[in-house]
């Protein structure tokens, strides 16, 4: 007799449960490809400059895809940087989907947040490895990778906190009670400070 195949539970790390499997697989491919080229590039390509260029291009593609496509489709979050033309001050702008319009798939969310936080840690490990092995020539590439991955990690973390605070204030405000007004005022003041 054939046993019935067990279906993975919602939120488990199975790409088949994703609401956007192509977006998820592309996101994961970009996340992993730069690390793989950095780690195994010298085995297949005997040219450090070519490995450097390919890794930088993959990191840039990953940064763009994560910031503009994967974040919006997988977890309903997006961020960008705006510069005030009069003062020249720069500030981040966070956008999240409306609570009632998009339901975030738990599988997409787990893959997204795991990849967001794991990649900077892996690059830090590779920086330590480059230092231990006295391969200082690779440190600029690792530094660029860290800047790009940590920027996205920080921005999406702040965007998620902003989204949760906005949703909390919005739900409190919609009840029309005194606590709702206080919560809305506090959250409004918190995010209006520059």
Curated annotation (Swiss-Prot):
It is found in: Golgi apparatus membrane. The chain crosses the membrane at residues 17-37, 39-59, 111-131, 136-156. GO terms for cellular component: Golgi membrane. Pfam families: DUF846. Signal peptide: none annotated. It is a multi-pass membrane protein. Keywords: Golgi apparatus, Membrane, Transmembrane, Transmembrane helix. GO terms for biological process: protein secretion; vesicle-mediated transport. It comes from the Eukaryota. Its main location: Golgi. Golgi membrane protein involved in vesicular trafficking. Belongs to the TVP23 family. This is Golgi apparatus membrane protein TVP23. The gene is TVP23.
